[in-house]
Amino acid sequence: MNKKLMYIFAIFIVAAITCISQPKKTTLRDKAMVNYAFDYLSSPGSLPFTTAATELSAIHGHSTSQYRLGEFYLHGSDGKPLDYTQARYWYEQSAEQENPRAQSKLGWIYLKGLGVKPDTRKAILWYKEAAEQGYAHAQYTLGLIYRNGSGINVNHYESQKWLKLTAKQHYKNAERLLAGLPAH
């Protein structure tokens, strides 16, 4: 067995033990270790190892890995088939740990009806979870939903509220949209 494979195996074992010992919430140390493993394994030719590492740590509760596994299923990438049900499952696991990117993706799934019946109200709930943590993309999307009345009544006040929060984070599209909204 060559040195690279032994090193990869050691990283998997350490990551698995760390994830098992922290089932509810991951620590900064856990995140750093898993991110290091992902960076190391992201070199050309390491796809099976990256996917396996992601799946292993996702199963053991690592929020970022759960989000990434959701991405694999949502896009049918990294050796995983396109499967909206699995994507939603893994995003939900990550969202329960307050991962704003996963919460925002759940909003997208419900807004677009990917594997579920479109549900603007559920989408808004998930986007708000992420937006209230300061996640600019979710804030911007909420601003658009309220501005355009996507499945709900137009609400300029809510639209401006979320777009202003997004603009404070230098999100240029939000700044442009704010210029065209009626003042409140």
Curated annotation (Swiss-Prot):
This is Sel1-repeat-containing protein YbeT. The keyword Nucleotide-binding does not apply. It comes from Escherichia coli (strain K12). To E.coli YbeQ. Sel1-like repeats lie at residues 64-98, 100-135, 136-169. Induction: Repressed by the toxin-antitoxin module MqsR-MqsA. Keywords: Repeat. The gene is ybeT.
